[in-house]
Amino acid sequence: MQVDRIILKLNSKFSNTISTWAAGSCNDLMQLSDRNLDVMSIDSLLIFNQNQVLKQDVQELRTQFDKYQKPILHIDINGTLAVGKSNLDLWIERNKCRSVLIIGADDLVDNVNLERFLNSLN
């Protein structure tokens, strides 16, 4: 991923997985608590899900980004790998994303498609 900063929510299994993956490819990796998340200081929101299901906390955060007209992308890890990867690349390029908040449910960690998708980005 060609972004300057990846922002993750603190203390979640999903964030820990993304943090491990991003450690080698991102210079600036931040983990913030919910109360320290400032939507105005983040360029965009990347949501990982499976089968288009969004948890309540993810939906609330999405609503905040919508309110400020920030770019949002959903990646369904059970979808086609090539389509998801190319959509992500185009989204980052088109929206000039520099800082991206990446969120997803903790149960995604158990889905083998998450690891497969992340490995395809390296």
Task: Give the ranges of each region predicted by the language model.
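Acidic/glycine-enriched connector segments
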Residues: 2-99, 103-106, 110-118
